[in-house]
């Protein structure tokens, strides 16, 4: 429920009751919708539009890669209200999927994390009240980035879990599988891989803990934790891919089979390097912060 991070505390109690309560209690599913077919990391190029008419906005456009899109009752939607301002023209809205003009489109056939449904969402003259706007016009990108800061810590934790599962499976297999008259774990080629896997896992864990602590401190200080979150997400996601790849290799032929779960860990790990900002975007964020650039 990372989407709850995008809900400003100053919103009315009626809106909180309508949107926050059912999602926070698990009675409803929420979603976060920023990406479009032609707009990923470069959010300022999004083509969806929200045109204001009095106290109502008319929304048209297509959003893609919406996690829980096929089942979500509510969405936090980011769309363009002033295209000339690029990312400073993005505005956020709370969306009720039951209203006319909300269309669930194709479900994505994904490489991994198949238990999580992902789809496109179409908006066809969808009407939303000004009361359901999050923040002011043009504040959407700022809200989206704040949500991503928190979300990247969660993705780091997800990546860590995948890496740990792949590592544990590899250790167990190395203890049991025999080749050339001995356990394969006795071979340095395997043992050294396991050592590297374990070391990276523990380093990733500490970066995630550090980011989580920075997030907690921000509640008192108001400071952003973008740097810590990006470092944790970058390292943990690349660790997940490194460990999952090594796990398949250690298992050999059976690692390529669906008889064992390591092939799933390999498929599931890849998305952690992509969503919530690719590894390249994380490196860009980290380097710009360290260099004092915007």
Feature annotation, model-predicted:
Residues 1-12:
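Short, small-residue-biased leader/transition segments that mark boundaries at the very start
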